[in-house]
Amino acid sequence: MKKSVKSLSLLLALIFILGLATGCSQESTAKVEPKTLKVGVTAGPHAEVMDVVKKIAEKDGLKIEVIEFNDYIQPNVALNQGDIDVNSFQHKPYLDNIIKDRSYDLVTVGNTVIFPMGIYTSKLKNIADLQTGATVAIPNDPTNGGRALLLLEKIGVIKLKPGVGIKAAVTDIIENPKKIVIKELDAAQIPRSLADMDIAAINTNYAITAGLVPTKDAIFMEDSNSPYTNIVVVRAKDKENPAVQKLIKAYHSAEVKTFIQEHFKGSVIAAW
């Protein structure tokens, strides 16, 4: 009889302990919040597209907090320091240059869009009207500056040293028949300086933010074969993070591609 009572007591104690454990487990599970990613973007099209991605990702249990930046420098600084988890604003040549200069441990996890760079003017009807001694604005960061110089070469304004490619710098100009004066400015500031320039090479995201319509206002644009595809970037240790993979899945959805096609009408091109 004593054995039976003792066995029953042990059984009841075990059931009680298991009940507590189950309750704690359920309580713990109930407190788990959906994963949130802080995603850094530049104002304009990158932010607009990410707002669409955000809504799609939320259906998959992923919350995205969009953090807007006003230049090309801080999004990588913030990502490297851990202030944000992801950024989406730059192309691969620009990232490669930043990694080389600053030794950031950052990697690409997916393609996003292409923003064709354009040549803009408030003074000329076409590039043939460009006068000797004209003032030309290009971005002052090495990658986009090189991109702008290649564009100027393509329209016949300058000639560069053979083989310099995307690493072209102003010092690589070997022919400048119109003796143009090149002003290297912060990419985000160039649209505001357009009235003071004869022509300017402007990144599409900043052109749109300034109220320009690339397909209408640019007198020349890069084509879809541009090597400057924009990318999603994370710290190397987060490359396989499931939340990051959910972000890429949402970005590469049919809904996002349709939004890009209908909203930007060719000024921005989906690159996946």
Predicted features by range, described:
Residues 1-36, 272:
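Short, low-complexity disordered leader/linker segments with a strong preference
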Residues 32-44, 62-68, 135-136:
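Short, well-ordered beta-strand elements
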Residues 44, 70-72, 82, 86-96, ...:
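Beta->alpha turn/N-cap motifs
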Residues 67-77, 164-192:
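Short helix-initiation/N-cap motifs at beta->coil->alpha
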Residues 97-109, 122-124, 196, 201, ...:
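Ligand-binding "clamshell"
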Residues 109-158, 257:
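A conserved helix-loop-strand patch within extracytoplasmic ligand-binding domains
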Residues 116-127, 229-241:
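A bilobed periplasmic-binding-protein/Venus flytrap-type ligand-binding module shared by bacterial periplasmic
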Residues 144-153, 251-271:
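Periplasmic-binding protein-like
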